[in-house]
Amino acid sequence: MINSSKIIIIGGGIVGCSTAYHLADLGHEVCLIESGKLTSGSTWHAAGLVGQLRSNANITQLLGYSVDLYNRLEEETGLSTGWKMNGGLRLACNEQRWK
């Protein structure tokens, strides 16, 4: 597969996996190389939180896309993502943030 692929991605963290997924979705033949288990490095140690509201509209839209993708990824690929929709609570740490 490496010899026939025009795109080779090294690293199976969230960025490598996402890049491979989106390029393959566009019809490219992609080979992803990972020395261990997918997402088992730095990606695994991250909190995995996907908050949906930010102060910037573009980032909020990107996070919304991420939530939609995680909701359908397991069905599309047949691979378990471990995605769970949980709530969250943000507290104002001072009076200015409260306003």
Segments and roles (model prediction):
Residues 1-15, 31:
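Beta1/beta-strand and adjacent pyrophosphate-binding region of the FAD-binding site
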Residues 2-4, 8, 40-46, 50:
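Accessory recognition modules or surfaces
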Residues 4, 27, 44, 85-86:
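A structure-centric signal for secondary-structure junctions around beta-strands
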Residues 10, 34, 46, 85-87:
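A secondary-structure boundary/capping signal
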Residues 16, 39, 97:
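Glycine-rich nucleotide phosphate-binding loop and flanking beta-alpha elements
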Residues 24-44:
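Glycine-rich FAD pyrophosphate-binding loop
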Residues 48-99:
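Dinucleotide-binding Rossmann-like beta1-alpha1 core, especially the glycine-rich loop
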